[in-house]
Amino acid sequence: MSVKLRLRRIGRKKIPVYSIVAADQRNARDGRYIEDIGRYFPLREPAEVRLEEDRALYWLENGAQPSDTVRSILRRRGLLLHHHLKKKGESPGEIESAVEEFRERMAEQGEEVKIAVGTRGQDPLERERERAEEIDEEAQLRAQATPLSAVQEETEAEEAEDVETADAEDADAASETDEPEAAADEADETDASADADDNEEPEDE
């Protein structure tokens, strides 16, 4: 049986918490496992890891292969270095001294690791968390933009209706103005014709 050290999700929706487990690599990610050896809290600042180091070393010595994220956790805690030195035959004292020195170096570089967010060395879970936050922000922006678009469309429709109403009123007013002017012109023509008839002289018989 091929054993893998990997993460198994146990957290609530949008609040992920992971068990660090030894499991048959043929099983589903969140399925059956052989042993639970720790917890990983990626959303805490900084991310928190609780790990039974002796059990992690036991599984490494028995050929278990860590996933990328678990490998990163083990490396930062000096367990991969411990396993490597033990395979080389170093004494327990030398191993402990080397691991302690490595952990001090990692602690000094802690701020540099935080600043390097977004680089190739970023943990897969960190990338997943940032991607989830980006999706949530995009959804919120879309939700805010939709009502504004609806209001804008309604306003434009009302403005178009007002323009049509104003044009119709102008047309009616122009029509009413033309009718009195036409009647006045007709009356003027009638008066002029009557004056012309009065001014005609009678013909001699």
Curated annotation (Swiss-Prot):
A single Gene Ontology CC term: small ribosomal subunit
An individual GO BP term: translation
Source domain of life: Bacteria
Key words of the record: Ribonucleoprotein, Ribosomal protein
Residue spans of biased composition, Basic and acidic residues class: 123-132
Coiled coil: none
Keyword Ribosomal protein: yes
GO molecular function: structural constituent of ribosome
Pfam families linked to this entry: Ribosomal_S16
InterPro entries given in the database record: Ribosomal_bS16, Ribosomal_bS16_dom_sf
Residue ranges of the region described as Disordered: 110-205
Biased composition (Acidic residues): 153-205
Keyword Ribonucleoprotein: yes
Family per similarity comment: Belongs to the bacterial ribosomal protein bS16 family.
Name of the protein described by the UniProt record: Small ribosomal subunit protein bS16
Protein's organism: Salinibacter ruber (strain DSM 13855 / M31)
The gene coding this protein: rpsP
